[in-house]
Amino acid sequence: MLATLMFILAYLLGSISSAILVSRLFKLPDPRSNGSNNPGATNVYRLGGALPACLVLIFDVLKGTIPVWGAYFLDLEPLALGLVAVAACLGHMFPLFFGFKGGKAVATAFGSLLPIGLSLAGLLICTWFIMVAITRYSSLAALVAVSLAPLYTWLIKPLYTLPVTFITVLIIFRHRSNIARLFSGNEPKVGAKKAPTDEKSDI
């Protein structure tokens, strides 16, 4: 019963789209229909600059961290804790309050992994930066980092490997359009002057 309640609360919290709310606060275009059409920090940065993007990023991370920390302190078993993290990500991807049109949940997924340990967070961040430096593809860096997350978790806290694997599968599924563009050579690189506006090129 408690796990079910936390699952619902995590989904509802995840459904609060900070990208849309911050864009309205700063009188920016709706990120769902402008830029890359992705309501996330990257697109908000494209539409409005660093300050609103940072606010979106922080809130999206907290959407994952807060419910998982709550589940952790309520002593939910690892599988239930993982489902809470998945619920937060699902809320971000398919927000109840915004027509079920959400983002890709990379920041929210990262936030949901923070309670496992800062060492895991550090490994994921380092992996992302290394891959961006090598390939210049932000989406590929995110995919590699999230794909390695179960391995990192197994090395640090093995009991959470299965829940983290759930999140990995969810994030990869959400990035299927990016994967297709990577294979076709049409995925924009970091620092490109102009990304296609008719495709969801954000991570």
Swiss-Prot record:
Topological relation to the membrane, as annotated: Multi-pass membrane protein
Entry keyword annotation includes Membrane: yes
Places the protein is found: Cell inner membrane
Main location: membrane
Ranges that cross the membrane: 2-22, 54-74, 80-100, 114-134, 153-173
GO cellular component: plasma membrane
Keywords: Cell inner membrane, Cell membrane, Lipid biosynthesis, Lipid metabolism, Membrane, Phospholipid biosynthesis, Phospholipid metabolism, Transferase, Transmembrane, Transmembrane helix
Pathway assigned to this chain's UniProt record: Lipid metabolism; phospholipid metabolism
Paired cysteines (S-S): none
Domain of life from the UniProt record: Bacteria
Pfam families xref list: G3P_acyltransf (PF02660)
EC annotation from Swiss-Prot or TrEMBL: 2.3.1.275
Keyword Transmembrane: yes
Catalytic activity: an acyl phosphate + sn-glycerol 3-phosphate = a 1-acyl-sn-glycero-3-phosphate + phosphate
Listed GO MF terms: acyl-phosphate glycerol-3-phosphate acyltransferase activity
GO biological process: phospholipid biosynthetic process
Stored InterPro entries: G3P_acylTferase_PlsY
Role: Catalyzes the transfer of an acyl group from acyl-phosphate (acyl-PO(4)) to glycerol-3-phosphate (G3P) to form lysophosphatidic acid (LPA). This enzyme utilizes acyl-phosphate as fatty acyl donor, but not acyl-CoA or acyl-ACP.
Subunit note: Probably interacts with PlsX.
Family: Belongs to the PlsY family.
Name by which UniProt lists this protein: Glycerol-3-phosphate acyltransferase
The encoding gene: plsY
